[in-house]
């Protein structure tokens, strides 16, 4: 099935990618283990100058430059957060519609991804009972945008507290 409204390619796991290309995964991993990293393209967490500038936005001392991580756009930031928190055996619940990476990044990494769909017949309001049923002891994260993108529905204090209580 092809989704013409999708803005991203289908996510692949590493083993699927290597099956697709015919490359040897073990040989690749061995090459990576022995590769010289003497060249340098910059700090992976962002340039010290940019990190200092971001930290400087906040009251002095509240945020240190070494606590700031610069990512390559919002997708990179979402990937960092999702993959830092989620592990095999976990699941996450995504309130849709949402950004595609919110459900494709964990799904592509083998994380069970459950969906709670906002519905027109409910005026796109979050069904808290459905959210509660979607969560279990292995739910590590509830992913939502607020206000929702693309619909624009906003969860205010009471609704956000309900989400926290369910989590």
Listing of model-derived features with the role each one plays in the protein:
Residues 12-14, 78-79, 102-103, 151-152:
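Glycine/Thr-rich phosphate-binding loops of Rossmann-like dinucleotide-binding domains
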Residues 66, 84-106:
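Conserved PLP-anchoring active-site segment centered on the Schiff-base-forming lysine
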Residues 120-167:
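Active-site phosphate-binding strand-loop segment of PLP-dependent enzymes
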